[in-house]
């Protein structure tokens, strides 16, 4: 999964695998969206309201709602309830579960490297829009 180099300070990530970089580029639009996905994946047994997600992730309600809708639109989570009170739940999908698991592990162990990759992708998207 993650290529590691061993040093005096312990394991240091050399770089994220290309498959993980590609998954981030294709599927992850922000750090808070990744945290939302990981949070729901870590708690698949129940549905969550946007208010609950925002509280657990120390995010604004607006950001939580935006991330939840984006993840729903891409098929990572389902939505039950009403338009006024939606509830979201992680959907296990065999074709992406291993990528999400690898990304969650990388984010837990090599947070700065994953965040750097997300910002690299965001900056490239922004530059392409302005050209």
Predicted feature residues:
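Long, charge-rich, low-complexity intrinsically disordered regions
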Residues: 2-3, 7-10, 89-93, 116, ...
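Short alpha-helical segments that sit at the start of domains
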Residues: 7-35
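Short helix-capping/hinge SLiMs at alpha-helix to coil transitions
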Residues: 26-30, 41-46
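Short, cationic-aromatic polyanion-contact patches
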Residues: 27-32, 81-105
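A short acidic, leucine-rich amphipathic alpha-helix
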Residues: 36, 49-55
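Short amphipathic alpha-helical interaction segments
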Residues: 58-74
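A short, conserved structural fragment
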Residues: 72-84
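Amphipathic alpha-helical dimerization/coiled-coil segments
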Residues: 98-131
């Amino acid at each position: 999964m993650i290529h590691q180099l061993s040093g005096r300070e312990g394991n240091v990530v050399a770089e994220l695998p290309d498959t993980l970089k590609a998954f981030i580029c294709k599927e992850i639009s922000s750090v808070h969206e990744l945290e939302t996905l990981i949070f729901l994946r870590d708690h698949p047994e129940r549905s969550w309201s946007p208010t609950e997600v925002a509280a657990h992730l120390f995010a604004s309600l607006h950001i939580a709602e935006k991330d939840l809708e984006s993840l729903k639109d891409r098929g990572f989570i389902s939505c039950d309830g009403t338009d006024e009170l939606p509830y979201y739940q992680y959907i296990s999908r065999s074709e992406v579960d291993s990528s999400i698991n690898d990304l969650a592990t990388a984010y837990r162990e090599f947070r700065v490297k994953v965040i750097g990759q997300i910002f690299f992708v965001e900056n490239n998207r922004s530059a392409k829009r302005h050209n």
